[in-house]
A protein has these predicted regions:
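Gly/Ser-rich helix-loop-strand patches that form or flank binding pockets
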Residues: 1, 6, 97-152
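Small/aliphatic-rich secondary-structure junction motif
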Residues: 1-43, 155-213
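Residue-level "edge-of-site" marker
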Residues: 19, 70, 125, 148, ...
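Short secondary-structure capping/turn micro-motifs that flank functional sites
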Residues: 22-23, 73, 128, 151, ...
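Structural beta-alpha unit
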Residues: 40, 55-120, 212-214
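Aromatic- and Gly/Pro-rich amphipathic surface segment
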Residues: 41-55
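Short, contiguous clusters of charged residues that form electrostatic/catalytic patches at enzyme active sites
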Residues: 48-51, 102-106, 110, 168-171
Length: 214
């Protein structure tokens, strides 16, 4: 789903895997230099995660399926406190595969702060408070993907009010709805039995914007 969102906006996509540092690295027996990363990738499960993501993006059609360019850990380069795979531009998309080590929230905050990301897309975590913490602490908009079936016809529930963030949410939702052909329901909720002009105006404005995008 993340690749579909990125394609809808013509945006650069970064796939980030955060995991603990393998015990072999703590023991000093393995170095993550480029020449040893491929040799010792068996010790680093994050490499397998990035490999899976790479081939999933190819099989979905997001990346051009070129047989001569495969997933090669030798193309991992160290940058500050992360490792990034350099992919050939011939894949037809601007994409980074990034490996970070540490606590997931801390590392994602660092990643979002070091690069100019607009949206962070995360899966529904089994951790009870993980999604809530990410929504609270990441300095980007956050899209939580939960129990997605790519073969299902989805509908977007676009929640609006009179806050300043509503306009951005409407524009974002409209682009996704148009590119993915998703129907949209606009909803606003009032704390009282009457809807003030702010809430009513927000709903009308959202509906008008969606109609203009059809």
């Amino acid at each position: 789903m993340g690749s579909r969102v990125a394609k809808s906006f013509g945006a650069q996509l970064a796939v980030v895997c955060v995991g603990p540092k393998p015990k072999e690295l703590y023991a000093g027996r393995v170095s993550l230099a480029r020449d040893t990363l491929a040799k010792w990738e068996i010790y680093h499960p994050g490499i397998d995660v990035l490999r899976w993501a790479f081939y999933d993006l190819k099989s979905s059609g997001f990346l051009e399926n070129l047989d001569e360019n495969g997933f090669n850990p030798l193309n991992m380069v160290e940058e500050k406190d992360r490792y990034r795979m350099v992919l050939p531009g011939s894949y037809g998309q601007d994409i980074d595969l990034i490996l970070r080590e540490g606590e997931i929230i801390d590392e994602l905050r660092r990643e979002c702060s070091e690069d100019e990301y607009t949206v962070s897309i995360i899966g529904g975590s089994k951790g009870r408070n993980m999604a809530h913490d990410l929504l609270q602490y990441l300095p980007t908009s956050v899209l939580v993907i939960k129990n997605v079936d790519l073969d299902r016809n989805y509908r977007i529930l676009l929640c609006v009010d009179d806050s300043s963030a509503t306009d951005r949410a409407v524009r974002f939702g409209a682009i996704i709805a148009k590119q993915m052909n998703f129907p949209v329901t606009v909803m606003t909720v009032s704390k009282t039995e009457e809807f003030g002009p702010g809430y009513s105006g927000a709903a009308e404005s959202a509906s008008s914007h969606l109609e203009s995008q059809q």
